[in-house]
Amino acid sequence: MKYMVLVDHPTAEGILYKGEIVREYENKPNGHIRVKDNMGRIWFVPKNILAKKS
């Protein structure tokens, strides 16, 4: 499933920018989701900053 990032999400490893398209990598039940960006980096982000993309 593809998602679009709604707001910038800074982490210790870098920043996931608003408008970037990411793919679901692994889903966790605690309200977070693990996604992979177009560079292959894996991010652990809250679901509320993502919007489903068709």
Each predicted region: which residue ranges?
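Exposed beta-strand and adjacent loop surfaces of beta-rich binding modules
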Residues: 2, 30-32
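A short, compositionally biased micro-patch
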Residues: 27-28, 38
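Conserved beta-strand/loop element in small beta-rich adapter and peptidoglycan-binding domains
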Residues: 16-27
